[in-house]
Every structure is written in C-alpha cells, then in structure tokens.
C-alpha cells in the first residue's frame, strides 16, 4: 500500500506474495495456499472424467485403462505422484453396481459415495467399503474375499479413498497438473503429440478415433439417405408403404434377421397351426448377431499372466470375431488357469491353451471345432502375433500360439486374432524370457513348466457393443430407416445364403453354425472317411506347421553326345 493510502495498488494486487490481507490475485494459485479441489472417486485421475474401465496402482490411485496405457508408454511414471509405473503394476478393479447404475458394496449393497472409505483387494481386484472388510474380515479373522472366497492378507488391502485423508484426492497436488504436462482426452494437446512415436500403445488412441469417426459417418449416411428417400418418386413411396403394411409400427429390434419366422406361410399350408397374417422378422440371438465378421469393430484388451511374466494383448474383433469370442469366454470362466505351455521352439513360436498339457486336448466354448477366419488384412508378418493352433482346416478349439518372428508360411492356415501390444522386439522382458526358457530337446516342452496363472480381460468388446445396442433400442434411436450402403451389402449377402423358408444354405466344404456337419448327400461316406482319418491320425496333435526346408538343388549331369564304345555291355 502506498504511503498514507488505504487503497491497494495494482502491483500489490497482482503480486503472488501472500501476506495476510495483502494477498494478491495470484497468491492462491500454487504451493501450500493452492485452493482445495477434490476429485470424485469414480473419476479417472488422468482424464478427470468418469472411468469406464477402472484400474488402480498399488498406492490406490484410480485411472481409466484407455487413458493410462498411452501415458505409461510415453512417460513411464505415475502422473499423480511421479513415481515409476509399468503396465504390469496396474490392477483391474471390479466394482459392483445396483439397478440404478450406482457403485455399491457387493456385500451390503451400500452406495459408495465421495465420503465412503473405499478399499480394494490386490489379488482379486474386488472393491468393498472399509466397514465391510473391517467388520467381516479383520475383526472376524476371516481372511478370504467375500465375493470369490480367495485368500488374502492385510498387505493386499489397498485404500482407494479415505475421507480422513482428503489430500490423496486433491487435484492441486497432482504432479502432472502442477508441471503442466499433457493430459489424454484434450484435443488441442493431443494434436501436438506424434501418435506414431507412441508405438503399439497408440493403437488404443487410433481405435477410439476410428470408432468416433465411424459413428459420425454412419449418422451422416443415415441423414443423407433419409433426404434421398423423401426426394424419390411416388413409386418408391408406394412400394415402401406396401412393404411396411406387413409389419407393425414398432421399432425394428437391432438383432432382427433379414428373413421372417415363416409362421404366416406355415399356418397357410397347415390347418394344425393358428393362422398368422403378419410377416414377423425372426430374431437372432446376441451371439449370432455379434459374431458376424465386421459387425463389432471395437478391439478387446487382455493380459496373460505367466510364471515368466505378463503379456498384454490386443484382440482383433473386427476380423476374427469367433476366435476372440472363444478366447474371452474361455478366459472369463477360468479355463486357462494353471494351464501350461506344452510347446516352445526358439525362433519360431510358443504354444499353449490345452488343459491336459499334452497338445491333444482342449475344446472351444461351443464344445466343438469352429471354422477358420482368414478374410481380412491380418498376416503373420511380425513378432508377437497371436493365432489359433489347429490340426487342419476348420479345427480350431482352445489352443493358441504366439509367434517369435514373422511366419508367412502360416498365412491362411491359422486364424490370427490378436497381437502383443507390449514391446515385441527381442529386447522385451516377457517374450525374451519365454523364448530363452530351457526346453526338452526331443519334445520342445519347457523345463520347468511355464504355467498360465490367469488371463484377465480388461475390455470385452462384445459386452460393450451389446450394452450400446440395448441402450439405443431403449431410447428409441433404432427405428427403421432407409438402409445404409453397409446394411444393403449385409442384406444382399444374407439373402444369397438364406432360402425363403429361412434355412441357411451351406457353401461347399463348410457347415452352417449350429447345423449338423454330417447331414446331406453322402453323409455316411463322409462319416466313414472321418473315422478312418481319426484312426490314422491318433498320433497327430494340434500343431503349428514348421517352416518347410527348401529342397536341395538336383545336380545336373552333363550328358555326353554321340554313341559310347559299348564297353559296359556284357
């Protein structure tokens, strides 16, 4: 303040110094005097938005998986406290919800709020209220997870939110905010990041951008097709009105088939059926609807935990939906737990997924073989490729393998359904440990065994897709409109494969889903040949073809011209 003046000058007001009442406008912007801003417990500590796929660090900081993976790839540290952080340190959280969609304690169903003391168990990832764990586990001396019944210790309890320690959720103390580092989710800052320099983790960002772009393009095509529909002549309008008269005014379900139930035709030709005058579309099951190639474009993410380290995987749902569905469903029901890798060849691949550990067992989630999926751009062109093992055409079950190098001779022989998203080069820790693991020279079996401790699914693309479709149907956004170009192609393809009775036509050498593989002309001959083949191949297990060695060049003998002297004749 000036001499003899009761007013604060401009320089004093703008000053960052804080001295009692003379604190300037910038006095509370940093340091110990920074204003307290609390982050809600259901928000990602990096994007500052509600999380969809929650994971936490051993210290209890919660992030969204799709945000923290690119950050770790670029910075290699915890954005909140600046400590070193790796992908393997992240713990997937399982938070229960009630019917209203609120996060609750899975035992007491008490709603978790910003004032609830919340903890998680390190070995299972289940989230509880502290009161529940203290009363039922600690005081009751029952050191087992109340949901999965797995044993845990006191050191496995991770505090996610403590109302008595408000500084742990204080935004003003977050390291990356104080240092002004880039935050994923802000478009203006993402534009300054070279996505190609992020390596394999940039695939997550590209996938999110591709999904958003595809949605906007579909919306634009739907709008343009609606305008074109209105501009068409009266002939098109009358034809569509006649077609619509056979169907009810209800919105068409998202899983409606391109053919009817056939009840109208059946009741017309049979007096034993109740008459039906409407042509109702048949409904596909959720599995049948989603397992069409190209239907679900979102990628899945999983982690295989082994005794030699963790392997993070990106699953290609768009090009191999059946293989991804099979892998995710088997992993979720614990099929791969304690399963060994029974074959490991250095410079070639490592194979596992057989619970018997012999290479002869294993079955798919359907209990039978499923067909190969070769359509698409995926090739065995790099180290870290994840593919299905088989013993011939359309004989995929539960066994899979991870390539140690490019294997072009396996293209169109084994279905590719994923890739290792960690550093796949020979310098990477886990793949290098697996490749250099000692094996039996005669059987190529690892000694000692390499065991799969667990397979964790971080992102289930089918579950996400189904929830989105059901939400759209509930909100009435799925009303029947003029089909887009993609829908027309799908409808044309289905019309070519389905008769007017709704029976699917099987192509040569293929079997319809859910059909009897032995039906049709020559089924007994095929069964006999199959039995003969089975007897001949009792010693053949599920295998991956090794690269054939090139045939040696034949020596060319230079023939002598003319006749000999007949000296070799008797």
Curated annotation (Swiss-Prot):
It catalyses: [protein]-peptidylproline (omega=180) = [protein]-peptidylproline (omega=0); S-ubiquitinyl-[E2 ubiquitin-conjugating enzyme]-L-cysteine + [acceptor protein]-L-lysine = [E2 ubiquitin-conjugating enzyme]-L-cysteine + N(6)-ubiquitinyl-[acceptor protein]-L-lysine. Residues 484-497, 535-550 have a biased composition (Acidic residues). It is found in: Nucleus. SMART domains: Ubox. PROSITE patterns: CSA_PPIASE_1, CSA_PPIASE_2, U_BOX. Residues 37-110 form the U-box domain. It comes from the Eukaryota. Its EC number is 2.3.2.27, 5.2.1.8. Pfam families: Pro_isomerase. Residues 215-253, 428-449, 469-570 are annotated as: Disordered. Residues 234-248 have a biased composition (Low complexity). Residues 428-446 have a biased composition (Polar residues). Residues 298-457 form the PPIase cyclophilin-type domain. May catalyze the cis-trans isomerization of proline imidic peptide bonds in oligopeptides thereby assisting the folding of proteins. May also function as a chaperone, playing a role in intracellular transport of proteins. May also have a protein ubiquitin ligase activity acting as an E3 ubiquitin protein ligase or as a ubiquitin-ubiquitin ligase promoting elongation of ubiquitin chains on proteins. This is Peptidyl-prolyl cis-trans isomerase-like 2. It comes from Aspergillus oryzae (strain ATCC 42149 / RIB 40) (Yellow koji mold). The gene is cyp8.
């Amino acid at each position: 303040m000036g001499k003899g003046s009761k007013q604060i000058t401009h320089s004093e007001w703008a000053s960052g110094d804080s001295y009692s009442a003379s604190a300037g406008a910038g006095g509370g912007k940093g340091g110990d005097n920074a204003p307290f801003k609390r982050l809600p417990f259901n928000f990602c500590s990096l994007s500052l938005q509600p999380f969809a796929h929650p994971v936490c660090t051993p210290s209890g900081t919660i992030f969204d998986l799709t945000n923290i993976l690119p950050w770790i790839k670029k910075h290699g540290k915890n954005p909140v406290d600046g400590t070193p952080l790796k992908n393997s340190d992240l713990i997937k959280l399982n938070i229960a919800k009630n019917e209203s969609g609120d996060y609750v304690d899975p035992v007491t169903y008490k709603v978790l709020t910003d004032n609830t003391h919340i903890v998680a168990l390190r070995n299972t990832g289940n989230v509880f209220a502290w009161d529940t764990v203290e009363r039922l586990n600690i005081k009751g001396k029952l050191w087992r997870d109340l949901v999965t019944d797995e044993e845990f210790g006191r050191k496995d309890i991770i505090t996610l939110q403590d109302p008595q320690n408000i500084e742990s959720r204080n935004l003003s103390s977050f390291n990356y905010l104080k240092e002004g580092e880039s935050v994923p989710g802000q478009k203006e800052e993402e534009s300054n990041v070279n996505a190609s320099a992020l390596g394999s983790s940039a695939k997550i960002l590209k996938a999110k951008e591709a999904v958003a772009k595809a949605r906007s393009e579909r919306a634009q095509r739907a709008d343009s097709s609606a305008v074109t529909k209105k501009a068409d002549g009266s002939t098109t309008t009358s034809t569509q009105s006649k077609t619509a008269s056979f169907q009810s005014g209800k919105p068409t379900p998202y899983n409606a088939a391109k053919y009817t139930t056939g009840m109208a035709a059946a009741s017309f030709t049979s007096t034993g059926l109740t008459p039906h005058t409407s042509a109702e579309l048949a409904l596909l099951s959720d599995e049948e609807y989603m397992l069409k190639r190209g239907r679900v474009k979102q990628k899945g993410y999983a982690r295989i935990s082994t005794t030699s380290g963790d392997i993070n995987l990106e699953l290609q749902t768009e090009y191999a939906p059946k293989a991804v569905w099979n892998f995710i469903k088997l992993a979720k029901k614990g099929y791969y737990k304690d399963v060994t890798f029974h074959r490991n060849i250095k410079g070639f691949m490592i194979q596992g997924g057989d619970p018997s550990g012999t290479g002869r067992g294993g079955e798919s989630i359907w209990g039978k073989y499923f067909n190969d999926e070769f359509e698409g751009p995926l090739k065995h062109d790099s180290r870290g490729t994840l593919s299905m093992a088989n013993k011939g055409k359309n004989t995929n079950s539960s066994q899979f393998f991870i390539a140690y190098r490019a294997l072009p001779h396996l293209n169109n022989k084994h279905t590719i359904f994923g890739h290792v998203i960690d550093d796949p080069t020979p310098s990477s820790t886990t793949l290098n440990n697996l490749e250099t693991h000692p094996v039996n020279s005669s059987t190529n079996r690892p000694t000692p065994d390499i065991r799969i401790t667990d397979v964790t699914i971080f992102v289930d693309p089918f579950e996400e897709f189904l929830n989105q479709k059901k939400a759209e149907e509930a909100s009435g956004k799925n009303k029947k409109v003029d089909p887009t170009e993609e829908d027309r192609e799908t409808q044309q393809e289905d019309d070519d494969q389905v008769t007017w009775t709704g029976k699917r036509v099987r192509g040569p050498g293929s079997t319809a889903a859910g059909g009897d593989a032995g039906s049709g002309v020559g089924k007994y001959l095929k069964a006999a040949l199959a039995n003969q083949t089975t007897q001949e191949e009792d010693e053949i297990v599920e295998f991956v073809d090794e690269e054939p060695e090139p045939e040696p060049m034949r020596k060319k003998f230079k023939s002598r011209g003319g006749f000999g002297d007949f000296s070799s004749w008797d």
